[in-house]
């Protein structure tokens, strides 16, 4: 920071105008690139949290003591396990409570028994609004 202040003072004192014009012209793209990087980091962090919540919901809904596993043991044939879907939804929502900065567009959860095996699939879709790139019209 100490090196930056004399440099900025030099730009301010320069009366030729070339430096100030070039600096002004390059400032907008530089800020846009830096802001885009921050938006990307934020979106990636939210995607990671959503994926972790989906993984926890998928695994937790078919754990040995889960409602889905217990219900699958009482089923006489293969099919969807409603208790598992509800349990997975609760696990996903619990993991994402308190996390902001995204809009969940869709959450598709299936928990079923096929050939005696309990399987779970959790898919989600979400939008993360861009803060810095939104200023220049990018979404």
Language-model regions: role of each:
Residues 1-16:
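N-terminal leader/signal peptides at the extreme start of proteins
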Residues 2, 37, 41-49, 56-130:
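Short amphipathic secondary-structure patches
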Residues 11, 19-20, 40:
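N-terminal transmembrane alpha-helices
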Residues 16-28:
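N-terminal signal-anchor/signal peptide hydrophobic helix marking the start
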Residues 18-21, 34, 55:
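Alpha-helical structural signal
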Residues 27-37:
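Single-pass alpha-helical transmembrane signal-anchor segments
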Residues 131-139:
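Short, ordered "entry" segments at domain starts
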């Amino acid at each position: 920071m100490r090196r930056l202040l004399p440099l900025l003072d030099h730009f301010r004192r320069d009366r030729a105008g070339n430096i100030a014009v070039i600096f002004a012209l390059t400032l907008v793209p530089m800020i846009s690139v830096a802001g885009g990087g921050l938006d990307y980091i934020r979106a990636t962090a939210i995607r990671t949290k959503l994926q972790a919540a989906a993984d926890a919901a998928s695994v937790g809904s078919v754990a040995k003591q889960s409602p889905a596993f217990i219900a699958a043991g009482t089923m006489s044939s293969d099919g969807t396990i409603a208790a598992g879907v509800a349990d997975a939804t609760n696990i996903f929502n619990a993991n994402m409570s308190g996390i902001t900065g995204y809009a969940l567009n869709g959450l598709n959860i299936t928990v079923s028994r096929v050939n005696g095996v309990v399987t779970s699939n959790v898919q989600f879709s979400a939008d993360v609004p861009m803060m810095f790139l939104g200023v220049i019209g990018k979404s």
